[in-house]
């Protein structure tokens, strides 16, 4: 589609190339993912143990292509990059993938539905098929209002907290509303530079970020931030409200989100009384 024509460096941790290892075991969960479509398999190597160029540029590639066309699907543009790198650069590496498909319930905790072990892409495809069955929820019609609660101890930034957007946006109706209860969020980026760039540009939508990316060197040098800004916007399709304790109304609205005081939000949407699913 001509959205990206840059080269991508294939870099992995040098320890993986140490020939004294006769087996390298990569363990992980296959689950829907906003950048690659379905997480794990070779992503564990090229991103989990990869260099910054690969991480940044594949995040940008996924953002350029669009989350709605990627989430929960195999053979995304990013996955094709990983497949090419696997076939052309590391096929002699003594890798064994151990892939799981799991769900979680309050009653039973983590349930393992599948365990897939081997090196061939076929085992990943089998895990993908099972994960699509177990980890994707389909709704009969788009949702007008969605409330997400972010654990106070786990989510301290919108960099992580915006998973609330990634994981719900395909189910939310045009003109709908997403309310994110985020008692622990106190900054935007996980580091100072990312935080600065998010505050500078905001979550202004895919087309605007692509325009800003072409015009601004600081975004070009921080492609993962540019990708994050794209993923963190609804592109004007539905409203996003952050209910927080530690950021001001001006800070939240400054990055293009709506603001609600946390105490006001929990009076309406008490996470201790609401249950997962429809209420």
Please name every model-derived segment.
Residues 29-32, 39-98:
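Mobile "lid/hinge" segments at catalytic clefts and subdomain interfaces of large enzymes
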Residues 161-279:
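C-terminal non-catalytic interaction/assembly regions of soluble proteins
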Residues 68-154:
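Membrane-embedded hairpin module used as a gating/binding unit in multi-pass transport
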Residues 147-159, 271-276:
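Non-transmembrane, aqueous-exposed alpha-helical and coiled segments at domain scale
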Residues 19-23, 32, 40-41, 50, ...:
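Short coil/turn connectors at secondary-structure junctions
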Residues 1-37, 252:
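An acidic, phosphate/nucleotide-engaging active-site surface
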Residues 26-27, 33-36, 54-58, 106-109, ...:
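Short helix/loop capping segments that flank catalytic or ligand/cofactor-binding pockets
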